[in-house]
Amino acid sequence: MRPAAITTSQRPARRTRSLCRDLECALPDATYVLRGTKNLRDTVLEALESGAEVLFYVTEAKGNPARLHVIDLGEIPPRLRLSFWLGGVKLQRELFGNRVDLSGDLVITTSKRPVSGHMKVAESLSEVLGVEFVPRAGSLEDVLEEALADVLLVVEGHPRHLGTLTFYRRTEKVGPSLFYRDFRTKDERMKL
C-alpha cells in the first residue's frame, strides 16, 4: 500500500476528528496530519515531508463529516483523484466498542453481487492506494485466503445510500463504515 496521510478541515468537530483517527488506525502505514490553522497547501507539504503519497482530506458540514477527498501526492501538482459525498459514518467505537489498530496487508473487495458502480469504486480505490482488488465470489474467508491479507475494505450496497465502505479485520466488521451518496473520479460521476 502507498503511504497515506489523513487530515481534516480547519477546526474540525469531534466526530470528524474521530473519523480521521479511525481511518489512521484502519489504513496500514497511515499518519494523521494535524491541520490546525494551516492552509491546505502547507498541510500537503507536511504530508509530503512525512513520506505520504496519498492524502485523505475530510471536510465537514454542521459538525459531521461531509466529504472525503482522495488526493494523489505523487503527481506534480497534487491532483484530486476521488471524491465521496458522505451521507453518514459509523465510527469504530459505535461498531466495535473501542478503537482497533488494524495491521497487515489491505485488500479491497465488493459484496457477493456487486453492481457496476461498486466495482468502479473498488477498482478506483485499489488503483489510487496501490493495493490488490479481489472480486468477491464466495465468502470473506475465500477473499482472505486468495489474497493472503488481514485487513479488508469492503465496498457494498446500502438501501438509503449509493454504497458503503467498511473495514474488516479478517471476517469481523470493526469499522469505520462510510456511507456515500455520491462518488466522483476525475472523469465520471455516480450519484444516487
Curated annotation (Swiss-Prot):
SUPFAM superfamilies: Class II aaRS ABD-related. GO terms for molecular function: rRNA binding. It comes from the Archaea. Keywords: Ribosome biogenesis. Residues 2-191 form the Brix domain. GO terms for biological process: rRNA processing. The keyword Oxidoreductase does not apply. The keyword S-adenosyl-L-methionine does not apply. Probably involved in the biogenesis of the ribosome. NCBIfam families: PRK03972.1 (NF003053). This is Probable Brix domain-containing ribosomal biogenesis protein.
